[in-house]
Amino acid sequence: MEKYLSVTTLTKYLKMKFDKDPYLERVYLTGQVSNFRKRPTHQYFSLKDDHAVIQATIWSGIYQKLGFDLEEGMKINVIGRVQVYEPSGSYSIIIEKAEPDGVGALAIQFEQLKKKLTEEGLFQERFKQALPQFSKRIGVVTSRSGAVIRDIITTVSRRFPGVDILLYPTKVQGEGAAEEIARNIARANQRDDLDLLIIGRGGGSIEDLWAFNEEIVVRAIFESRLPVISSVGHETDVTLADFVADRRAATPTAAAELATPVTKLDVLAHLQNQEKRMVTAVRNVLSKKQEALKKCSQSVIFRQPERLYDGYLQRLDQLQLRLKQSLRTRISDNKQLVQARTHQLVQLSPVTKIQRYQDRLGQLDKLLGSQMALVYDAKVAEAKRLSEALLMLDTSRIVARGYAIVKKEESVVDSVESLKKKDQVTLLMRDGQVELEVKDVKTKEI
């Protein structure tokens, strides 16, 4: 009876065969990129030809070292190993190395980085710096032993002796060259005594010149405070450093000429021209001054010099008169001021104040006496009037005149409305009192 395998068992067997097959451990494969969408980490896509498709994976660390970006439809050559993914039973190739098919990877990387930096604006003319007319010290980032530095020194010395050349010895090709170039550009920018920077190397293949296409070098040039001249390779060679630099020179000699736009002979010719212009200007000024002196010597002032100061003498006389008048007015004003101040001092004297206060006190004393007499008389009259009013209210005086006073419970009855039938009342009379009982109450019509 046949034994049936599980799917897992079969898949594990196939995976083992794939893993141990020497032909699948290192596969050289060519195909077209399909279903590619760039991810921030690992890259997953397909490789296909006209009749088949295989899934492909590039781990993040490998992809970052490719030097170019994959694109949909790009044909590439890859080296990798084939493996089986057990959960789905599918197989794929794990890519360890890749390069474009046909066109070199460096050319693609060049165009991709150029496009990226162009979109960022690094190559725009508005960022270009003007080169100085007169540089006292020029920095050069290049190889110590190459012909570049010799050509630059020779050309600068010939065109303008006295300009200092400061070399930053740099590896210009191979591994680590780009980092060293960028580092020396940054070092040069730390100095305050440099006016200009030249970076370059001699000719070579695209691989030899590649360090000057690296992003780290391009950004270092863009961020440079110093103006930068790029002189990389021959006239037909073009690097990204040329695009971002402030000026591009086809040769080291041309770079040195750009760095010294004004030569020693130009300066001498300029000085000679300036000397001629100065001599001409001095002669013209001297001639004009001589002509002016001649005219002055023929003027009335020179023939009759006293007329020069006649007006000033008249002005002096007028000022003297005005000064005397001003002094008289000032003295008169001051006298009046002294008199006014003297009068004020007299008024402010303690003796004067005391006399004034004594006079005022006498007046107030007399006024107080008269006012007190008036108040006293008024109070006496008021007391007499009140006394008479009190006498009029005395009950003994009322009954003495024949009147009687009616009281109810010790209260004086002043109206029949306060009484009612059978109330007990007391009748006060001149010689005694009578106890009565009210028999009837009659109200008098008014």
Swiss-Prot record:
It catalyses: Exonucleolytic cleavage in either 5'- to 3'- or 3'- to 5'-direction to yield nucleoside 5'-phosphates. It comes from the Bacteria. Its main location: cytoplasm. GO terms for cellular component: cytoplasm; exodeoxyribonuclease VII complex. The keyword Cytoplasm applies. It holds the Pfam family Exonuc_VII_L. It is an enzyme of class 3 (hydrolase). CDD domains: ExoVII_LU_OBF (cd04489). Its EC number is 3.1.11.6. Keywords: Cytoplasm, Exonuclease, Hydrolase, Nuclease. It is found in: Cytoplasm. One of its GO terms (molecular function) is exodeoxyribonuclease VII activity. One of its GO terms (biological process) is DNA catabolic process. Heterooligomer composed of large and small subunits. Bidirectionally degrades single-stranded DNA into large acid-insoluble oligonucleotides, which are then degraded further into small acid-soluble oligonucleotides. HAMAP family: Exonuc_7_L. Belongs to the XseA family. NCBIfam families: xseA. This is Exodeoxyribonuclease 7 large subunit. The gene is xseA.
